[in-house]
Amino acid sequence: MTFLALDVGNTRLKWAQYDAPVVGAKLLAHGAVFLENIDRLAENDWHGMPEPSAILGCVVAGDAIKRRVAEQMEIWDVLPRWVHSSPQEAGLTNGYDHPARLGSDRWVAMIGAYHRLLARGIRKPCLVVMVGTAVTVEAIDASGKFLGGIILPGHGIMLRALESGTAGLHVPTGDVRDFPTNTSDALTSGGTFAIAGAVQRMVDNITRHCGEAPECIMTGGAAWKMAPSMSVKVELVETLIFDGLLEIASRRFKP
């Protein structure tokens, strides 16, 4: 019973095929494509792939993208299922004012992070940081309640905003420096410090609220670039959303 997991973000679609819809399943294949190339998945990445027994995904890119992805899966006689944020799932309680409005990728990543800690016997507050097109920082207490989170622009959005609103800032990407002495480094360092500072503020908030410092788990396409500049210790987990999808699938697709 193979299982196909999908993470459809704002920029790329990432997929992973496992030998079963269970936690700890063996990874058989995986890949990623930019959204402009998803109409060729059936003839490229998924060509010749055995038909999965179950498909589960999360999508934040909108209904039009979801329909295009669904069309590519018509090569199989399997109906894909999509995660929608709910009041409770897999041991987590959703503290959002309107739970269904929470981005499904944020919800799935939190489920993956929470169970990653539980598997190691850790019951502590947790921050989940996703660094991609946008940056999100989610706070979860030791009981598994999502307390709330923040959203801020990713590096690319910050730079484009400055370029469009300020004359003379069309410069190459720079490096992160403690004291930048050129515009390229100043822009790159400013964006990096803004993200790192937001995470530190959330660490302070949850530490004050829960009475102990949190574990910090970071994921996303730009997480590896951000990690060296963080002021707090973070654990980098590339597969966090897939881990969350496996946790959900193990409950939804029971034999």
Curated annotation (Swiss-Prot):
It is an enzyme of class 2 (transferase). Pfam families: Pan_kinase (PF03309). ATP binds at D7, V8, G9, N10, T11, R12, L13, K14, T133. Its EC number is 2.7.1.33. Its cofactor is NH4(+); K(+). The keyword Secreted does not apply. SUPFAM superfamilies: Actin-like ATPase domain (SSF53067). The keyword Ribosomal protein does not apply. Disulfide bonds: none annotated. Belongs to the type III pantothenate kinase family. This is Type III pantothenate kinase.
